[in-house]
Amino acid sequence: MKKAKETKVVIFGDYDTGKTTTLEQLCDKITKVEYKGTTLALDYGNCIVNGEKIHLFATPGHERFKFMLEIISNGLDAAIIVVDNSRGVTLAEKEIMAELDEKNIPYVVFSNKQDLDDSELEIDSEVEVFPTVATEGSGLMEGLEVLLEKLN
């Protein structure tokens, strides 16, 4: 029996952008390491998309946990950057995009919280942006599928 292809996708974003909620919507079961609702180390889940097993890791967004980004990012195939559309792209998110661009790692941006602010996200990069509402699951799978197509 042929083993299904496996892909590691890391979900980045500043604090409180909806990374964990995005992961919860995309995966049936997830593992969280958190304290009082704040991700401390990482969140993990997996799902099958078009016969491919996807391992999803959500990073902590708070500055004090930034050291975890490098650990979680080791060996990633692709990335999702979740931006709170009501705040716009933060400096931390711009830095992550620049690093992904430098390493030629494919990524997409989820312009999240469209239910709070549906204005168009202003972004300097040529990256594909998907309007999302993570609490409703809106736009998430479409964005993930496009990201996975970039790998093939």
From Swiss-Prot:
Q: Which GO terms describe its molecular function?
A: GTP binding; GTPase activity
Residue runs in coiled coils: none
Superkingdom classification of source: Archaea
| InterPro entries registered for this protein in UniProt | Gliding_Motility_GTPase, P-loop_NTPase, Small_GTP-bd, Small_GTPase_MJ1339, T_Tr_GTP-bd_dom
- Residues that bind GTP, according to the entry? 13-20, 85-89, 149-152
Claim: Transferase is one of the keywords in the record: no
Which keywords, in A-to-Z order, does the entry hold?
GTP-binding, Nucleotide-binding
Q: Which family does it belong to?
A: To M.jannaschii MJ1339.
Protein name from the UniProt record: Uncharacterized protein MTH_765
